[in-house]
């Protein structure tokens, strides 16, 4: 279908569905891909979302459910019968079925599995044994494997006998009679090699398979660094149990980016979540921010007498705190990116710290001169201008310590620094900013 027409259908569903009949909406949905329908559902309020989903054909529901975010997926699953869900997912790939079923209560999951064939049930139960954030949770058992003593001609004949190759098949895997992984051969190499050659002679053994327990973010990093389309997955005994393909890795990268973005703000992924759920997802970090606000306020309270005597200190002190907070967030962002890409280690963190410290000092000198001039022009007080300039440099330097040390500590404590880091670093720079500015004012002005 033409991309323009597809985008127009999506826009009509999102913007004008209330003005359409059910048949008109159904016809538009029939012309859209699963990902486009999922986008339409995620862009709709809950009541309209349920209506749109009810208009889908049963065979389309599985693909759409897989494309949805976890919260919306769970909402829709609660309104689908076990029989309908079994029918909806039966044509999906293993990893896609596992992704959907693992969001169900255990009792319901067992009922769904009991409706499936023995072969499908065994494959899915194997997939469910792995955590969803590991290579095992991403794998698909639809793999093509051959023996090392097969000839290339035999391999080609075997491939021709398949009804169709699994999606994203760019290589086949070589295993022994115990199904232990030995190597791989690209499809291109099979086609261009002499048919009389033996698999052992041309198979590649340089690239190691992925362990089933490997974290999904590490899987994504390996795919990115090696430009992979697919990769084999082995169990703890070195036996081939499946493969991961690039489409699954793209989903991991997208979900990780969404979680980091939403986690930093402490909000839910469902844009149209009910008020109660949305409030519940935000209240924790709002409460944490309230605690840190009281910490900053108590710091200011230590200098209440100074502020009473020199009122315009209250006007200027937010400048110092704000500049430190922004600088700390910049450093934090760099560190988070480095940690995510696995670029930061004990050998280079010292160099990075010195670099960030030098940047903060240079920025501090430039900005302190600017702030000093503005303050003097505003209040005609050279002492205040000098004090706020000094406090600004101090706080920018502290922002380096906060932006680097805080995420490393959170990582050490097995906490996600992307979620809690920003709250902690801004608290540090607020406190240091107020202490340095008001402390210097107490020493030199009182």
PLM feature spans:
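Hydrophobic packing positions in regular secondary-structure scaffolds
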Residues: 1-264
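Alpha-helical transmembrane segments and their membrane-interface boundaries
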Residues: 257-393, 397-401, 405-419, 423-427, ...
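Active-site His/Glu-centered metal-binding helix of metallohydrolases
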Residues: 431-432
């Amino acid at each position: 279908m033409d991309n323009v027409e597809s985008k127009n259908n999506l826009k009509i569903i999102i913007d004008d569905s209330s003005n359409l009949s059910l048949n008109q909406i159904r016809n538009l949905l029939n012309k859209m891909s699963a990902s486009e329908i999922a986008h339409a559902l995620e862009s709709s309020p809950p009541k309209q979302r349920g209506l749109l989903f009810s208009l889908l054909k049963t065979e389309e529901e599985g693909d759409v459910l897989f494309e949805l975010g976890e919260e919306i997926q769970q909402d829709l699953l609660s309104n689908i019968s076990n029989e309908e869900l079994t029918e909806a997912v039966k044509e999906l790939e293993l990893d896609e079925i596992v992704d959907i079923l693992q969001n169900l209560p255990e009792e319901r999951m067992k009922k769904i599995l009991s409706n499936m064939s023995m072969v499908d049930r065994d494959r899915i139960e194997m997939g469910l044994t792995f955590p969803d954030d590991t290579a095992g949770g991403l794998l698909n058992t639809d793999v093509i494997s051959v023996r090392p003593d097969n000839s290339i001609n035999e391999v080609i004949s075997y491939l021709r006998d398949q009804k169709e190759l699994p999606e994203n098949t760019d290589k086949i895997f070589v295993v022994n009679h115990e199904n232990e992984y030995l190597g791989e051969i690209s499809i291109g190499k099979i086609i261009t090699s002499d048919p009389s050659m033996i698999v052992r002679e041309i198979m590649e053994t340089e690239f190691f398979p992925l362990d089933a327990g490997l974290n999904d973010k590490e899987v994504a990093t390996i795919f990115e660094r090696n430009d992979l389309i697919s990769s084999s997955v082995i169990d703890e005994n070195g036996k081939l149990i499946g493969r991961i393909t690039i489409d699954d890795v793209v989903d991991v990268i997208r979900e990780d980016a969404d979680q980091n973005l939403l986690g930093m703000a402490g909000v839910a992924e469902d844009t149209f979540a009910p008020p109660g759920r949305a409030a519940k997802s935000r209240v924790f970090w709002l409460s944490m921010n309230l605690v840190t606000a009281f910490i900053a306020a108590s710091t200011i309270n230590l200098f209440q007498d100074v502020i009473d005597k020199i009122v315009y200190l209250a006007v200027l002190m937010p400048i110092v705190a704000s500049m430190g907070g922004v600088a700390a967030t910049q450093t934090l962002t760099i560190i988070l990116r480095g940690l995510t890409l696995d670029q930061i280690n004990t050998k280079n963190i010292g160099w990075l710290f010195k670099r960030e410290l030098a940047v903060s000092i240079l920025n501090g000198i430039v900005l302190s001169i600017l702030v000093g001039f503005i303050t003097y022009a505003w209040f005609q007080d050279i002492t205040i201008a000098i004090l706020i300039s000094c406090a600004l440099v101090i706080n920018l330097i502290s922002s380096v310590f906060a932006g680097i040390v805080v995420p490393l500590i959170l990582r050490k404590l097995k906490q996600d620094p992307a979620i809690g880091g920003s709250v902690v670093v801004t608290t540090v720079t607020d406190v240091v900013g107020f202490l340095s500015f008001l402390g210097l004012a107490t020493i030199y002005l009182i």
